[in-house]
């Protein structure tokens, strides 16, 4: 291609751009020649400006349970007609739409009524889209921090019902009428949160009459959001560890008392649980309005572990009892030795021997009455003259003392074995009871809420 045609083509394109820019320049100059951004854009002051409002939710940034603040990223779409900003496209080179700064035109002073950080107004003055009919579309972005009553009773399986109340700050319903663009906020560009999911959303228009001016309506549009928390993070990091601590607590009663490690395991579990609770305490909403489910479960786990320590002390004390310190009541023997083992099929547990020694010591057949000088019973059969000897008498007396001592020791050992057997039976019972309480307690805390959520779908 030769240089001259190329230069001619570039010149024509540049001329078109200049002409287009000149048309917009003339148009803007004409539109704002006598424009007053303070005056409502109506032909008759008795007319009301109709503003269509639409809320587009982009992101759920944060839910602050303690301060009860929900932070969201939104786009607030506002549409109205300004009769002062109309033109004929044929007079301006076919220009039908232009973008102008929002500061130059009249705008509805929409604010977030339930704002929680003191900044009620929308302060991001982006450009508006204006067409030749005077129709204006303004979609400024905003970060809303709205107040929301956070109910943590069912945390972390909770649902929150939060709202955003939008309305004009100075205009009543007789001069500015706001209408919702739709009965639902726009979620087409919503970025999913890792902690919350929006189950339901709706928008309502309200006519409010205040006591100061009962004949004048004030309009607002309120958007409600039902948000459900995703509990997986708390299940993995809080609930399952607490369940494992409870399971370890029950295993304390499976450990033999003779090993001497019962209290060591119990205290170790308690210390581990305490450190664990100190680490995860920041994950739980620190509010006194209600005790959340996860707080109840952590309290249950702590009481569960402490109760196991107290009962373990009682079991160890029972295991080490002796006849010199405790006499076994008959009801204890009947319940823990005779009854419960049969009911619970403790066939593998060796019971203590309760047989009394019926065999008589051979010295009972020997006449030792003359040791004290008193006549004994008449002799039966052969009576050896050796027992008359003093040394023999002394030996017999010593043997009898040893036999009685051995018999006493045997009775003491039998009594001690009975106490150990009672402690062993208690361990077996408590193992079953604690495991059952661990399962029932967990279900009692969470099952009701989980069933309710399942029914809601």
Curated annotation (Swiss-Prot):
Residues 317-428 are cytoplasmic. It catalyses: K(+)(in) = K(+)(out); Na(+)(in) = Na(+)(out). GO terms for cellular component: acetylcholine-gated channel complex; neuron projection; plasma membrane; postsynaptic membrane; synapse. SUPFAM superfamilies: Neurotransmitter-gated ion-channel transmembrane pore, Nicotinic receptor ligand binding domain-like. It is a multi-pass membrane protein. Disulfide bonds join 148-162, 212-213. GO terms for biological process: acetylcholine receptor signaling pathway; membrane depolarization; monoatomic ion transmembrane transport; neuromuscular synaptic transmission; response to nicotine; synaptic transmission, cholinergic. GO terms for molecular function: acetylcholine-gated monoatomic cation-selective channel activity; excitatory extracellular ligand-gated monoatomic ion channel activity; transmembrane signaling receptor activity; transmitter-gated monoatomic ion channel activity involved in regulation of postsynaptic membrane potential. One of the alpha chains that assemble within the acetylcholine receptor, a pentamer of two alpha chains, a beta, a delta, and a gamma (in immature muscle) or epsilon (in mature muscle) chains. The muscle heteropentamer composed of alpha-1, beta-1, delta, epsilon subunits interacts with the alpha-conotoxin ImII. Belongs to the ligand-gated ion channel (TC 1.A.9) family. Acetylcholine receptor (TC 1.A.9.1) subfamily. Alpha-1/CHRNA1 sub-subfamily. This is Acetylcholine receptor subunit alpha. It comes from Bos taurus. The gene is CHRNA1.
């Amino acid at each position: 291609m030769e240089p001259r045609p190329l230069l001619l083509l570039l010149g024509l394109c540049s001329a078109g751009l200049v002409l287009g820019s000149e048309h917009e320049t003339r148009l803007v100059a004409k539109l704002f020649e006598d424009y007053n951004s303070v005056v409502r854009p109506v032909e008759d002051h008795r007319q009301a400006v109709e503003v269509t409002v639409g809320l587009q939710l982009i992101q759920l940034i944060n839910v602050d349970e303690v301060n009860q603040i929900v932070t969201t990223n939104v786009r607030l779409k506002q549409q109205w007609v300004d009769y002062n900003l109309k033109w004929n496209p044929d007079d301006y080179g076919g220009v039908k739409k232009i973008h102008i700064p929002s500061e130059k035109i009249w705008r509805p002073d929409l604010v977030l009524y339930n704002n929680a950080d003191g900044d009620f107004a929308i302060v991001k003055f982006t450009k508006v889209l204006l067409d030749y009919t005077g129709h204006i579309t303004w979609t400024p972005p905003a970060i809303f921090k709205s107040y929301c009553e956070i109910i943590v009773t069912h945390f972390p399986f909770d649902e929150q019902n939060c709202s955003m109340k939008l309305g004009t700050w100075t205009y009543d319903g007789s001069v500015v009428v706001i209408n919702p663009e739709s009965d639902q906020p726009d979620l087409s560009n919503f970025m999913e949160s890792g902690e919350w999911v929006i189950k339901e959303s709706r928008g309502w228009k309200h006519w409010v009459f205040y006591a100061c001016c009962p004949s004048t309506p004030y309009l607002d549009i309120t958007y409600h959001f039902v948000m459900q928390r995703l509990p997986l993070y708390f299940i993995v990091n809080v609930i399952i560890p607490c369940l494992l601590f409870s399971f370890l607590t029950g295993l304390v009663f499976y450990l033999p008392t003779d090993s001497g490690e019962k209290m060591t395991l119990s205290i170790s579990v308690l210390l581990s649980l305490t450190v664990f609770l100190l680490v995860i305490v920041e994950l739980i909403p620190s509010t006194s309005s209600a005790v959340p489910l996860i707080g109840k479960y952590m309290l249950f786990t702590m009481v569960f572990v402490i109760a196991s320590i107290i009962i373990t002390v009682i079991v160890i004390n029972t295991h080490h009892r002796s006849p010199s310190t405790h006499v076994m009541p008959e009801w204890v023997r009947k319940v823990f030795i005779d009854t419960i083992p049969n009911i619970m099929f403790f066939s593998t547990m060796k019971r203590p021997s309760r047989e009394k020694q019926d065999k008589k010591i051979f010295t009972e057949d020997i006449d030792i009455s003359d040791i004290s000088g008193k006549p004994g019973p008449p002799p039966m059969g052969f009576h050896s003259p050796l027992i008359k000897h003093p040394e023999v008498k002394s030996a017999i007396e010593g043997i009898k003392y040893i036999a009685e001592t051995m018999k006493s020791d045997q009775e003491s050992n039998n009594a001690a074995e009975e106490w150990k057997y009672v402690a062993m039976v208690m361990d077996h019972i408590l193992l079953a009871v604690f495991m059952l309480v661990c399962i029932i307690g967990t279900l009692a805390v969470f099952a009701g809420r989980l069933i309710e959520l399942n029914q809601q779908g």
